[in-house]
């Protein structure tokens, strides 16, 4: 990559890879976003199976989306720090496909949430599975 963008990306990669505090901060933000977003989503997914019916706070979705925003930004920063490794990694692309599936499932889940029933349970089960598979893929990327 050449030009100003290439120079900026190379500068970021140098800073990220050579500065432990920067690397740690970005990695922490990524893990914290997954923990908060995934934890809240898993809690809501579990509530969908309650015999009393789902009691899901509508503000929960904003928290999950905010956490996903943190994951997106920190993930982009990690990607830009090592483009060659990530862009050629099958695990990375599988993880990205899982993230797209999670977002699509979340869209459907929000639409069926008020009705409850079998579709809420299905999207909740899929959500829990996708969050855990994304975590597994992310773990495979860093090990």
Identify the meaning behind each predicted range:
Residues 1-143:
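Polytopic transmembrane helical bundles with strong interfacial aromatic enrichment
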